[in-house]
Design a protein with these regions (language model features):
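Extracytoplasmic/secreted proteins, especially bacterial periplasmic and envelope-associated proteins
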Residues: 1, 20-33, 45, 68, ...
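Generic structural signal for hydrophobic core residues of well-folded globular domains
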Residues: 3-9, 36, 81, 201-202, ...
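Helix N-cap / loop-to-helix initiation motif
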Residues: 38-39, 110, 270, 305
Length: 324
């Protein structure tokens, strides 16, 4: 059967063309008998064997699904090609080039880091976890901006009957397959990881790590010249742990991630300067404009792609070198 299909695999495919495949197989067996490679008994037995009994067909994942744990990294690369005018004037021509153009694509995937990222996810919030929590890990090399791993707790698929199937790339922006929400934002709330950007602007404005702060919950006056309508004097953030409602300093506030202390830091700065700084290292809205300048930004309340936050931290790790 296999020998008969090699001349024209599609034409003699035993799954889609069983009759043609059987005729071809019988022809091969006849030639083998003539050349005395098999006996008449072996010939009769083989010819009498139905094609269906020889097949054990199992579905193999196609496209990026065949990349295993790196399927979403693969999808990111595919979306990069399909969204870039460098590869054609429209999506159809880019897809044609991608599938039939003989492109040789070299990626930045680090298999060791990809495996480590996937192992961490599956060990903590695995695919199909009862909590329903979506989890993703993105790894970027500081100084180069190279994406080295993208992992998430879902199966790569078209969102069929299995609720864990999706082709959305949780870590990415909309252009690369990320989750674009109805309000025009993409990704997830970064939460307290955004405090690092507040701290960077704090130092940029000449403030010190030893500056005293009060972490006692209260309201603040905000400096938001680019969006004065967002100045909410009634907003009063709270600390997760009431024992932190006390005097502190910037160093301890960072170490303990104290919400109210960081709110005081933000109140001493221009909130617009913080969003502009965030934009300078790639943390923006889906359309590339700065995040909304509002007090709650100190708690990471606005959705951003995890890859953007990973790249922001890579900028810190590289000594301030931001790579798009």
């Amino acid at each position: 059967l296999m020998a008969g299909t090699t001349n024209a695999p599609s034409a003699y495919d035993p799954v889609t063309q069983p009759e043609l495949a059987k005729n071809r197989m019988d022809w091969v067996l006849t030639k083998m008998l003539e050349e005395k490679f098999i006996t008449k008994a072996q010939y009769d037995q083989a010819v009498a064997t139905p094609i269906a009994s020889m097949l054990h067909v199992s579905e193999s994942p196609a496209g990026c699904g065949a990349a295993g744990s790196a399927a979403y990294f693969c999808s990111y690369v595919v979306n990069e090609v399909l969204s870039s005018e460098n590869f054609g004037p429209d999506v159809a021509s880019r897809r044609q080039l991608l599938t039939r153009g003989g492109l040789k694509i070299t990626t930045t995937l680090n298999l060791q880091r990809q495996s480590a990222a996937d192992n961490v996810i599956q060990s903590n919030v695995p695919t199909g976890d009862a909590s329903g929590t979506d989890t993703t890990i993105a790894s970027i090399e500081p100084g180069t901006g190279r994406i080295q791993a993208l992992a998430q707790n879902s199966n790569y698929g078209d969102g069929g009957p299995d609720s864990s199937d999706t082709q959305l790339v949780y870590a990415a922006d909309a252009k690369h397959g990320g989750i674009e929400l109805s309000d025009g934002t993409v990704g997830f709330q970064p939460g307290s990881t955004f405090k690092a950007l507040i701290l960077a602007e704090w130092f940029k404005e000449g403030n010190s790590a030893g500056a005293g702060l009060s972490a006692v919950p209260r309201t603040f006056q905000w400096n938001i010249p680019c969006a004065p309508e967002n100045n909410d004097p009634t907003w009063a953030p709270k600390n997760v742990d009431p024992s932190l409602n006390r005097s502190t300093n910037v160093t301890e506030a960072t170490k303990m991630s104290i919400n109210v202390a960081y709110a005081e830091m933000l109140s001493r700065m221009d909130v617009c300067a913080v969003t502009n700084f965030a934009s300078s290292i790639g943390v923006t809205k889906a359309d590339g404009t700065p995040l909304d300048a509002r007090p709650s930004i100190v708690l990471g309340s606005q959705n951003v792609p995890p890859l953007s936050m990973a790249n922001a931290y890579a900028t810190f790790a590289s000594g301030g070198k931001y790579c798009k």
